[in-house]
Regions:
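Structural alpha-beta junctions
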Residues: 40-48, 85, 97-99, 126
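Intrinsic low-complexity, intrinsically disordered segments enriched in polar/basic residues
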Residues: 1-2, 80, 90, 143-144
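Intrinsically disordered, low-complexity regions of eukaryotic proteins
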Residues: 50, 54, 85, 127-129, ...
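Negatively charged, low-complexity tracts enriched in Asp/Glu with abundant Ser/Thr
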Residues: 2-70, 134-140
Length: 144
């Protein structure tokens, strides 16, 4: 059986419908796609990284990876293009689930930019910034 290999280069060239096709291919293909993105990202120290394989996080995106600090007071969701959005998004989600904020959009996969965003949020959180302040800093950086 021939297998498709999803590399960072492949992730950066996929169009939204291809992500949806992988999701429609079932849990095994969706897991492969999610793990390809997870392998290319650096999780901040002391944070958890969890991928969606069924509909654990609502099932809105073909790839959704949640990064959560140990206190668990918010998560960052890395969401792939698909039917909902043509772009990669990083979404700030408070523990209550709302209001959420899209803090970064990317026309193509860029693990460097996403990892930078994760790292910046981790540092701001560790330094005691409020959630509103973290979102404001990202907006000033041009991320939001």
């Amino acid at each position: 059986m021939m297998r498709n290999i999803i590399t960072p280069a492949v992730l950066s060239t996929m169009i939204p419908q291809e992500f949806e096709d992988w999701r429609d291919g079932g849990e095994v293909l969706r897991r492969e796609l999610t793990h390809a993105a997870m392998r290319d990202l650096t999780c901040p120290a002391g944070w958890d990284m969890n991928g969606e394989y069924r509909s654990e996080f609502g099932g809105f995106f073909p790839v959704q990876i949640r990064f959560t600090p140990s206190r668990g007071n918010f998560s960052l969701a890395v969401c792939s293009p698909g039917d909902i959005s043509p772009s990669w998004m990083v979404v700030f989600i408070p523990v209550s689930g709302r209001p959420f904020s899209v803090i970064r959009t990317l026309p193509a996969w860029s693990s460097e930019v996403i990892t930078h965003t994760l790292s910046l949020v981790a540092h701001l959180d560790a330094d005691g910034y409020s959630q509103a302040s973290i979102i404001s800093v990202l907006a000033m950086e041009g991320a939001a």
